[in-house]
Amino acid sequence: MSSTDIKPCAVNIPVSAHITFHYKSIADRSSSRSSSSSSCSSATSKACSPRGSSVGLPPALSTDNEIVETVLNVSAPVVADPTRPSLFKSNYTAASCLTSDPTSPSLLPSSRRNSVLPASDFHQCAHHKNFQRRASEPQLPSFDNRSSSEMKRSVSYAQHSMMFPISDQQEPQTSASPNDHSDPSCPCNRHHHRRNSVAVKFDKPLYERLET
């Protein structure tokens, strides 16, 4: 099998993401303060973002504007094979979910909205022998018949040093191989978790002005 026969997978393609800053003029704060406070107290299903600062805006916009809301937009990776199932379940945006109708065209999978990954993609492989056994299992040693006598040292420190002398030569420091602690027979060690993770590539942020 050549390298051209291998089809790209959605796992290995970086996910494109960018942050959208929704800003508003500071002069419009007094006019919209009464309407925003009434909407926050009357409806609980709608999003009401607090007024922020100008941190995050470019110098040309940070003088007379303030950030109202920040939205993280994540687009699903484009897979070469259309028949291959994508890792992304559905497109989702927190702001649009609260303010828009679920059946609106803006929430369809074809739009560039946030994508939710299934929880199984974040699971790590764990081996049963890495877990400590329960006290009720018979493999554990029994602590019922303990000796009441204290442990005594039968060899002095001087005799012990003569029997097992400490070498003055330093042990050669060898670099640890990545396959030292891997078992090829285990199916969990045939892949790397980081290689199966989803990489996010952040593009330049976008700035949208909210009109009153």
Curated annotation (Swiss-Prot):
Modified residues (Phosphoserine): 136
Biased composition (Polar residues): 167-179
Cross-referenced Pfam families: DUF4667
InterPro entries registered for this protein in UniProt: DUF4667
Keyword Phosphoprotein: yes
Ranges where the record places region Disordered: 30-60, 129-212
Biased composition regions of type Basic and acidic residues, renumbered to the chain: 201-212
KW tRNA processing (keyword) present: no
Bias (Low complexity) ranges: 32-49
GO cellular component: cytoplasm
Keywords: Phosphoprotein
Note: Present with 2360 molecules/cell in log phase SD medium.
Name recorded for this polypeptide: Uncharacterized protein YNR014W
